[in-house]
Amino acid sequence: MELKGSKTEKNLLVAFAGEAQARTKYTYYASKAKKEGYNQIADIFEETANNEKEHAKIWFKLLHDGIQSTPENLKDAAAGENYEWTDMYFNFAKEAKEEGFDKIAYLFEEVGKIEKEHEERYLKVLENLENGTIFEKNGEVYWHCQNCGHIHKGKVAPKVCPVCDHPQSYFQVRAENYK
């Protein structure tokens, strides 16, 4: 049987969208409950949001034949962000302006700019992955272990953190945008 074009495929799409939206909504509700001093209720919303995320993952994997490799996921993510900034938000802003919703049009335009940055970031990370420069740079940089905070100076991130024994995957180039 072919899933593509079937009623079941449409149902999976609706189920995925519904679960993904519920997850996001429940995280907003959790934040509000926490701000209002209801930590137990916030925890219930967070737990349910995590359940909804897992439900969405089931439907996503069925729709996409699993979850692809990181390079494929980066390409897919970049394509989605490209659509959002070149088409979706551009047209949404235009329509909002035509209808007199200038503030909403402005927000669509500004979010579109952010989506463009997202696309560029995904493409740059993909380029780094393809060039083998995720954990190796041309010049010396500071590498930061995200687990214990160890700082290593060099062209290559350590294979294993000398402090906490976590693997190289925990290292990122240290950002110093706070100075």
Label the predicted regions.
Residues 1-179:
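Non-heme di-metal
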